């Protein structure tokens, strides 16, 4: 597809440039012949074409050809976003997902507590470990004070 625009002298054309790219660039740079205006109506939005002089008349010539394309908008370049449902519906299994998530969290907490309990199965071992730690720390303090 050949681009209708001319930028200065000769136009460089990329081999990967498509018709869509040229269409979008032409529209972006203001090289289009009409613009699309979305008007809000009671039942949603409608598309209205505005010509270059901005008066809203789509047909400037005086011929009376009855063409059905003048009455309908050209939606070929319109986004497919209108095909999605208008209301968002949450997944049906939201409650089940939340319950499973809570169950998994409780299971992880229980496993962690069990590991701690296994590590110190006897309260005597736990208190003995604390006493060793205190003794070692106190002896380090004494040694550093004597120097």
From Swiss-Prot:
Knocked-out gene: effects: No obvious developmental defects. Plants missing both SOLF1 and SOLF2 have reduced endogenous cytokinin levels and accumulate lower levels of trans-zeatin riboside monophosphate (tZRMP) and N(6)-(Delta(2)-isopentenyl)adenosine monophosphate (iPRMP), biosynthetic intermediates of bioactive cytokinins as well as decreased response to exogenous cytokinin in both callus-formation and inhibition-of-hypocotyl-elongation assays.
Location within or outside the cell: Cytoplasm; Nucleus
Disordered, as annotated region: 32-147
Coiled coil: none
Domain of life: Eukaryota
Any Gene Ontology CC annotation: nucleus
Primary subcellular site in the record, as a coarse category: cytoplasm
GO-annotated biological processes: cytokinin biosynthetic process; cytokinin metabolic process; cytokinin-activated signaling pathway
Biased composition (Acidic residues): 37-77
InterPro entries: SOFL
Compositional bias (Basic and acidic residues): 114-131
Skewed-composition ranges (Polar residues): 78-93
UniProt biased composition (Low complexity): 96-106
UniProt keyword Cytoplasm, yes or no: yes
Annotated motif SOFL-B, positions: 76-85
Keyword annotations: Cytokinin biosynthesis, Cytokinin signaling pathway, Cytoplasm, Nucleus
Motif (SOFL-A): 18-23
Tissue-specific expression: Predominantly expressed in the vascular tissues of seedlings, developing leaves, flowers and siliques, but barely detectable in roots and stems.
Function: Involved in cytokinin-mediated development. Together with SOFL2, triggers the endogenous content of specific bioactive cytokinins derived from the biosynthetic intermediates trans-zeatin riboside monophosphate (tZRMP) and N(6)-(Delta(2)-isopentenyl)adenosine monophosphate (iPRMP) such as N-glucosides trans-zeatin 7-glucoside (tZ7G), cis-zeatin 7-glucoside (cZ7G) and N(6)-(Delta(2)-isopentenyl)adenine 7-glucoside (iP7G).
Sequence similarity: Belongs to the SOFL plant protein family.
Comment text on domains: Domains SOFL-A and SOFL-B are required for function in cytokinin-mediated development.
PANTHER family according to UniProt: OSJNBA0091C07.3 PROTEIN, PROTEIN SOB FIVE-LIKE 2
Name of this chain's protein: Protein SOB FIVE-LIKE 2
């Amino acid at each position: 597809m050949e681009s209708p625009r001319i930028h200065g002298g000769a136009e460089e054309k990329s081999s990967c440039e498509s018709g869509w790219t040229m269409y979008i660039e032409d529209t972006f740079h203001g090289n289009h012949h009409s613009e699309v205006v979305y008007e809000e109506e009671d039942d949603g939005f409608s598309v209205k074409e505005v010509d270059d002089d901005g008066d809203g008349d789509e047909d400037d010539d005086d011929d009376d050809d009855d063409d059905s394309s003048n009455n309908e908008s050209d939606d070929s370049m319109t986004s497919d976003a209108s095909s999605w449902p208008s209301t968002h519906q949450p997944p049906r299994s939201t409650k089940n997902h939340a319950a499973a998530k809570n169950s998994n969290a409780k299971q992880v907490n229980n496993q962690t507590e069990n590991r701690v309990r296994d590590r110190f199965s006897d309260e005597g071992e736990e208190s003995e470990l604390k006493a060793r730690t205190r003794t070692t720390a106190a002896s380090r303090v004494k040694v550093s004070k004597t120097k």
